[in-house]
A protein has these predicted regions:
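Active-site neighborhoods and metal-handling regions in enzymes and metal-associated proteins
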Residues: 1-297
């Protein structure tokens, strides 16, 4: 249960882990492992090895064994070494840990609820400041939105990092998937239309990802209709009751029905699972038209 900051917006360490019935080896930059973490790992039977030694160790394995490794996600050089070692039989299959992490335990759920409450406070404070500054006639941009959100989230003593780059998209920019405003290319907020804000943070006790659409003033009739129909999609998925053989794409279909009724659709996914103090996107669950992972309570 280690955390680091090796990856932007993701509190993970760059590492490999090799697990057998008799031992577990963590390949990591040992100089960055604190004495407390090292002692805890060793007490749980985990041996540390240098990050760059993974290829040599795998090539030197002589004990006949079957190794599970997913070719789609494992580093290709590592996968090649495994395949080229005659003592190893590679089983190309999905990482079973993903399914285990996808079902949160009661402790994780309790912490997630707490961090979402604090994150909601930051969101409310952001909205109040945004409304007040716009009402005062101040010129604000998509970059200003990012700055205000960071100010309120980072003020929390459990804040670690944004869970991804904030998507603050005004008007037509919101139609671009994963749009990101830059100092060279951004929009000025106006007192009309919609502002889309897709943002989140990782705290010591959880990770958040929340999307909200704010009307900044006068709306067209189409904007009102599309907003209302999309809201109905969210209400339907929140009220959905499913059986134990229901998978992700079945729920995704339920969510889209209010829009399909009008022969329109949204091109993005309906939602996705979020890790516990980790990746903002965590498999295997994701509500879209392709995912057949079974839902679990």
């Amino acid at each position: 249960n280690l955390r680091a900051m090796d990856i932007e917006c993701t509190p993970y360490a760059m590492a490999y882990c090799y697990v057998t019935p008799n031992r577990a080896v963590l390949f990591i930059d040992q100089a960055r492992v604190t004495p407390e973490a090292k002692a805890e790992l060793e007490a749980n039977g985990v041996t540390l090895a240098d990050y760059d030694s993974i290829l040599d160790v795998m090539a030197a394995e002589t004990e006949p064994q079957t190794v599970l490794a997913e070719s789609a996600t494992v580093n290709y050089a590592v996968y090649q070494v495994l395949e080229n070692n005659p003592a190893l039989t590679v089983k190309d299959a999905a990482d079973p840990l993903l399914a285990m992490k996808g079902v949160k335990n009661e402790v994780e759920l309790a912490h997630l609820r707490e961090c979402h409450l604090r994150d909601a406070v930051a969101m409310v404070r952001f909205q109040i400041e945004l409304e007040n500054r716009l009402a005062a006639g101040e010129t604000l941009t998509e970059l200003t939105v990012d700055e205000i959100l960071h100010k309120y989230r980072s003020a929390n003593d459990k804040f670690l990092v944004e869970s991804f780059g904030t998507i603050a998209a005004y008007g037509g920019n919101a139609a671009m998937m994963h749009y990101h405003a830059t100092p060279e290319d951004h929009a000025v907020l106006q007192r009309k239309g919609f502002l889309l804000v897709d943002s989140g943070a990782t705290y010591m006790d959880g990770t958040t990802d929340i999307t909200r659409t704010y009307p900044l003033g006068e709306l067209t009739e189409d904007e009102r209709l599309f907003y209302t129909w999309t809201l109905q999609c969210h209400i339907d998925i929140a009220k959905a009751v499913w059986l134990d053989y229901c998978d992700c794409h079945m729920l995704d279909t339920i969510a889209r029905e209010p829009l399909w009724r009008h022969l329109i659709n949204y091109r993005c996914g309906t939602g996705h699972s979020v890790s516990f103090v980790g990746n903002v996107h965590e498999g295997p669950h994701a509500l879209n038209g392709r995912n057949t992972t079974l839902m679990r309570p």
